[in-house]
Regions:
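N-terminal binding-site loop/beta-alpha segment at the start of enzyme catalytic domains
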Residues: 1-73, 132
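Conserved, mostly hydrophobic/aromatic
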Residues: 6, 18, 42, 50, ...
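Short, well-ordered coil/turn segments that N-cap beta-strands
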Residues: 9-16, 46-49, 70-74, 100-105, ...
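Active-site mouth loops of central-metabolism enzymes
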Residues: 21-33, 77-86, 209-211
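Glycine/proline-rich, positively charged
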Residues: 26-27, 63, 83-199, 204-205
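Conserved short secondary-structure transition element at the edge of the structured enzyme core
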Residues: 43-44, 184, 188-250, 264-277, ...
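Short hydrophobic/aromatic-enriched beta-strand-loop microsegments
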Residues: 72-77, 158-166, 250-256
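Ferredoxin-like iron-sulfur electron-transfer modules
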Residues: 253-272, 283-302, 316-318
């Protein structure tokens, strides 16, 4: 698979990366050995870039996969939501131990929202120190927000940025409002021009765009400002689909079968705003005892109307 450098980091990654979140306990909850085999399969077929996070609880899948073969030049990115110095440094050390890696290639502040940069100065200092101490090779942030992505372009120490973008503009934020793919692409372009490594997330909008598989991938892979596209996988067949697409052998009419997909609402991200409930035509979304949204699968039509309106991307189709 074609590889590119992540900005000026000197780190070379496959143009498609493997997002490990879907196989973990937040979504599919695959047995570790089963998930590890999928990762190993992708590594064997040229994908060398893996994305995980402290929050995902997926380190065991990666650790097990790396023991299944002699894989060279594997690049691992992890992230943490910790805002303070000690919490972030502990997160880096936890990743090193859990992944059995002396150095974590990339470590990010996870899902930075508008107005949060000042709140995370302790975490930022920890990442700077971690790089100085040789614990990480590069550091930066991930965000769904245009203003944060734009700000990243002028952060001198920042090496990489991991923004959300897709052809439908789903989930792109700016302050407390939704934004557009055009605004996000402009922010990404500024990061790229500044020498920052850029790899993107949510090409399928959290699963909502999977039924437009090739259109979704055409959009992100056509952008020279994006060094790599992170795709979430939970099956070997999904890896094969991507390989077929990138290899140019996929039938132009092909779209994956999404008839068995289910809607899942991540309770740790949900804010109970009611947007998804209002959008559901089947009355399948209700509030639980904690005031958070859940899905009654006996009523759910899997129409996907709920996912695009969630301001924090807590609604996922898998």
């Amino acid at each position: 698979m074609q590889k590119k450098f992540l900005g000026n980091t000197g780190i070379k990654v496959s143009i498609a990366g493997f997002g490990v979140l879907p196989m973990g306990p937040s979504q599919l909850s695959l047995p570790v050995e089963e998930g590890a085999k999928i990762i190993a399969y992708a590594l064997e077929h040229g994908i060398n870039f893996l994305d995980t996070a402290q929050y995902y609880r997926t380190y065991p899948y990666i650790s097990s996969a790396l023991k299944m073969g002699s894989f060279e030049d594997v690049v691992i990115c992890s992230k943490s939501l910790c805002e303070d110095y000690d919490g972030m440094m502990d997160a880096v050390l936890e990743a090193r131990k859990a992944l059995d890696r002396e150095v974590i290639d990339i470590f990010l502040m996870h899902e930075v929202r508008s107005g949060q940069l000042s709140l995370r100065q302790g975490a930022w200092k920890a990442l700077k120190d971690a790089k100085k101490e040789g614990l990480v090779r590069a550091f930066g942030l991930s965000s769904h927000h245009v203003d944060i992505t734009k700000a990243a372009s002028s952060m001198e120490e920042l090496d990489v940025v991991f923004p959300l973008i897709n052809y439908a503009g789903l989930g792109i934020r700016k302050g407390d409002s939704f934004s557009t793919k055009e605004e996000m692409l402009e922010a990404i372009s500024q990061c790229h021009a500044a020498g920052k490594g850029v790899f993107s997330m949510k090409a399928f909008g959290g699963g909502s765009l999977t039924g437009h598989y090739q259109e979704a991938l055409d959009y992100v892979f056509s952008k020279p400002e994006i060094d790599s596209v992170m795709i979430g996988f939970g099956k070997i067949s999904e890896v094969d689909d991507l390989l077929s697409y990138l290899g140019g052998t996929m039938d132009k009419s092909y779209n994956p079968d999404i008839s068995k997909k289910r809607v899942y609402i991540n309770q740790e991200d949900c804010e109970g705003c009611g947007s998804c409930k209002a959008a559901c035509p089947a009355g399948a979304i209700f509030y639980n005892e904690n005031g958070l949204a859940e899905v009654d699968h006996s009523k759910c039509l899997t129409c996907g109307y709920c996912s695009p309106v969630c301001p924090v991307r807590a609604v996922i189709m898998y």
